[in-house]
Amino acid sequence: MTGISFNLPDDDAAPAPVLPAADDVPCDGWWPGVNLGALRDAVRVPSGETERLRDAVRQAMLDIAGELAAWRADQVAAGYAKLADVPGRIVVDGKSDYELRWFRAVYSVVAADVGERAVGPQLSSAGADRLEALRADVDVHLRNVAFAVRDFLGKPRIVAEAL
């Protein structure tokens, strides 16, 4: 008689997918890097044109890191080696509010950049009716950038429209 034995898993949770390291865009070791696959899923960026997306991520990281440079300097002076070491004001799903808002800001800059490219000169007359919807999407992403940065810094949100 032959038999097969196996151990049942401890829980029914599926293991987290392993994303390829080649899709990672690191950011100087202090700020968290961005995985292009996770970004595509989060902001519904179509696959393809990976190098353009990588460039958009690099530029977004530079933009947001620049806006948060003074805050970072204060944290480094306080002895924190990276953003993940800074105690969050609140932790959601195992991530600090700082980490979540960093990713929201970077992802929103990328989404706005991708949206602006879609609105660019290659837009045909057949797609002109989508122009306003695309512009509205870009505006929402830019608003999300501003909100994420202000929330990160603990500043109140400001919404103003030109009349």
Model-derived features: where do they sit?
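Conserved short "hinge" loops at termini or chain/domain junctions
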Residues: 1-86, 91, 147-163
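Short loop/turn elements at secondary-structure junctions
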Residues: 94, 98-163
